[in-house]
């Protein structure tokens, strides 16, 4: 005891341990870098190799927003002359999503990049094709983010308004205020990073999905006339009580239902930040559309059954699940909880979409194809704060300005979702075309992988063409014009970049790689080194 109190052997042992640790650190710092490895990853500014599977699942599920998609997508498919065929539409859309997932996983099993589809496409296409794919993907992220912000403000505003003494719908001022509040929440969460917020994001989405699944089961279980799953499937192709237009109507519904899957691959944007990305990312990309598709199919069955039995007009209703529950005598119990769940699902989707948007801008900034300031990160959270500021300003100021100018909330959402879905589909075409070319280049092309990629690309090209026609016929030509304008500007910008900055063009497609800093023999970054 006296020895310990007077600084005897105990202090000597601690001193020896500290000295030993210092010698090990000095040996590591003085060792030679491993030959053949870069000193550090191109994405060293990010908090690499820290995220587990839960964070990636939260990102992909949040981007799809299965609760919100399952409430809004089926009614659109039904009203577009699909009728009961909407159930077939949902099932076929799930198959298309799985084909696209197979093409994407060609890359996720071999590389990790925050640019996701943009960086993947560069491995199989030329730089111009990759840049156009990335531009379309940016448009997809931004369009869906705008739609989610507007929709979340609308749903939450509806709950607030119905809870007020007047019980009227939300006014423009309330919607703008709530949109700004949601945007602030998105900014805080994305700035802090997925590592600290993924559990919240996943929890919100899981609770929202449970609410939608429970509401769908309630619709199917309430006393009254019902159609079994098999009855709906067998009644789908011919004309029925909902006015199915046969195969053409089913195909129109497939296009709409496919929009309920866009974003399922966005977990790939977290590749460099994920532990064991070549194992985790492919699994998430494969299973996320399956899980989300199951919810969508259940909700579609419930809505087809409900519209057939209640006489609610699917072409008129703005809140289908609410109206169907009300028609079945369940509206009072389900109205506010369901709308809150859907509103929160849209918030989660906005967070995930902005997260992916920011990572894509970061990747482009790292390559130098856009300003390198987008590659700067927060010193503490190691998230791309400059890209966040630019991206969030775009997706927030545009809808707020439109609302203040008197543009109807529904019109803003329709243009945004039309633009976003078109952007996603074009990006999916790019990566589906790139997959077999990449496999052939590395000598791993097989008949199965080629068939899946070709089928996905062919179906997507057909759907993009049909979706453009649907948007034009529905009077939503603005979404098509935005897509055409963005891709045209991207082509002009790329041609100028190739002429004046050819080395930056050659950098397109950079992906994460093991560096000498990642192994024991490497020289770690100096303490206190700037991450920006």
Regions found by a protein language model. Name each.
Residues 1-85, 97-98, 223, 230, ...:
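Membrane-interface "cap" regions at the ends of multi-pass membrane proteins
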Residues 35-154, 266-267, 272, 469, ...:
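Transmembrane helix-boundary motif of multi-pass solute transporters/channels
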Residues 42-47, 90, 165, 171-173, ...:
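Helix-loop-helix junctions that connect adjacent transmembrane segments
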Residues 73, 221, 424-427, 445-532:
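A generic transmembrane alpha-helix motif of multi-pass inner-membrane proteins
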Residues 76-81, 85-87, 161-172, 195-204, ...:
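Transmembrane helix-loop boundary segments of multi-pass membrane transporters
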Residues 119-122, 126, 161-162, 287-353, ...:
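TM-loop-TM module centered on a large, flexible mid-protein loop between adjacent transmembrane helices
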Residues 136-151, 266-273, 332-372:
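Membrane-helix boundary/coupling elements in multi-pass transport proteins
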Residues 174-225, 284-292, 423-426, 441-457, ...:
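Membrane-interface loop-to-helix entry segments
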